[in-house]
Amino acid sequence: MVQKYYESDADPRTLEDKTIAVIGYGSQGRGQALNLRDSGCRVVIGLRPGGSWQKASEDGFEVYSVAEAVKRADVIQILLPDENQAAVYRAEISPNIRENACLMFSHGFNIHYGQIVPPPTVDVVMVAPKGPGHMVRRTYEEGKGVPALIAVHQDATGQARAIALAYARGIGATRAVVFETTFAEETETDLFGEQAVLCGGITSLIKAGFETLVDAGYAPEMAYLEVLHETKLIVDLIYEGGFTKMRDSISNTAQYGDLTRGPRVIGPETYMAMQEILEEIQNGKFAKEWMLENMVNRPVFNALTRADEEHLIEQVGAEIRGFMPQFRK
């Protein structure tokens, strides 16, 4: 069973005399930094010029270059995009990190695939909230928290796990629950979930359903409403209470169709494709492909993104959402 931690397992005094540098001030960076500060931690922000510098300053933080923030910090939380982390680490973090400092991540990609190799004199940990930054912040302000994962890759000081737990408490995660994992497990399951189910799987399934109905002569608007618009209704029910709550909330006709037709759509061929995708994640093929894609300015990424942006389902969706007050700006 997975090890679970709660408020009583995390000692906030572990961070009492430490300065935390949050590198990056996007959604996660801002949410985590604000929560840490409200929990009594000393936080500085490390950024490259421009971008979020002004926003972080307006939020009342001391903002420095990445290199300067790292020099001042005992804990360095890297919250930059995966594809940017290695270059920033080599240029600005590695030359300035203190001995016995703690290097922290919210995703294990760069450590797991060897793009960042820290010295043996520092702790290397992960604290990964299972929710976007704005939710991390909102739930904290409500007195609750978003669950998180922690992992210890390297324990140079003997305090790595204690630091990770104290940080998780600082962002509010121990108010919910914190699960212990490994960098390998977090990275591989996270990538698989994104590719096969949450992002790649769902969008491909929706497009296939939309195209099937449109090709059969049904109105694109009807196809959109049936295979995309109503997705949120079903997913929300599953999120709240699993498959059981969803099936308790739909008609018997819908449930019978779900149970008898669903496995024909997601059958043995899909399972085999998922196994292949998982193997490419495990053996590093996907990571290598993504790193090479970034080295040549993302031609495949950009072409596929444009193609989906121009798909009929996006045009129809924009029109239908225009009729709905909740989506009007």
UniProtKB/Swiss-Prot annotation:
Binding positions (substrate): S251
Residues the entry annotates as binding NADP(+): Y25, G26, S27, Q28, R48, S52, D82, E83, N84, Q85, G133
Record's keyword annotation contains Nucleotidyltransferase: no
PROSITE patterns, sorted: KARI_C, KARI_N
Annotated metabolic or biological route of this protein: Amino-acid biosynthesis; L-isoleucine biosynthesis; L-isoleucine from 2-oxobutanoate: step 2/4; Amino-acid biosynthesis; L-valine biosynthesis; L-valine from pyruvate: step 2/4
UniProt-listed Pfam families: KARI_C, KARI_N
Positions of the catalytic residues: H107
Enzyme Commission (EC) number: 1.1.1.86
Keywords (A to Z) from UniProt: Amino-acid biosynthesis, Branched-chain amino acid biosynthesis, Magnesium, Metal-binding, NADP, Oxidoreductase
InterPro entries, per the entry: 6-PGluconate_DH-like_C_sf, KARI, KARI_C, KARI_N, KARI_prok, NAD(P)-bd_dom_sf
Domain KARI N-terminal Rossmann positions: 2-181
Every KARI C-terminal knotted domain range: 182-327
Binding locations of Mg(2+) 2: D190, E226, E230
Name this protein carries in UniProt: Ketol-acid reductoisomerase (NADP(+))
UniProt organism field: Methanoculleus marisnigri (strain ATCC 35101 / DSM 1498 / JR1)
